[in-house]
Amino acid sequence: MQKWRYFWLNVVVIRLLTACGPSQAAELSMVTPPATPSEMMDTAAPNPAACPVTQPSASPFVPPPPYSPDAPYQGEFWYGTEVLWTLLSTDGTWRQLPQNKGVYTQKTFWWKKGYDWRTEPTPSLTVTGKRLDGSAPPLEASVATNGYHDDLKSFMLVGVDLPTAGCWEITGHSEGHDLSFVVWIEP
């Protein structure tokens, strides 16, 4: 048990330092054939101002207890509904993402009311994504895993690999419910 606590503490520390490492899951929830060089080319010039990133609303989402009504980290906000929510950057940008084999990697954290990491070690959650400002293969996502930290409570974690920078719509799918957001991936 002690070993698992250290493992999840490391996951949260990495998130705090915004130096998330590459996705470690061996399995992918989406099987995509390797992209050809022409598929990997950006067809649109990067224009972050034209990307409709998801911003905090005037009436922000407040998660149900036992979760804090305030996002656990400065510069981030809760986004979604009780059936599925996530934590997003207030400026809608993912910066300085590590690259692994030519793709940008990020870890996404998700929650849903009643989720317990101890009883659902492999959460019913998949993540998909598509680039909005140019052509690119879809993102690849790891199989969802579970986690717990005092600041975050029970959470679901999915690693994503994005083949290009640019404007991306990312969608979480869980038990018939979908939640989408738009983020700018800084090159």
Tell me what each language-model feature is.
Residues 1-8:
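Bacterial N-terminal signal peptides that target proteins for export
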Residues 8-14:
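Sec-dependent N-terminal signal peptides
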Residues 16-19:
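C-terminal motif of bacterial Sec signal peptides marking the signal peptidase cleavage site
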Residues 21-23:
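Bacterial signal peptide processing site
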Residues 28-163, 167-187:
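Contiguous segments within soluble domain cores/interaction surfaces
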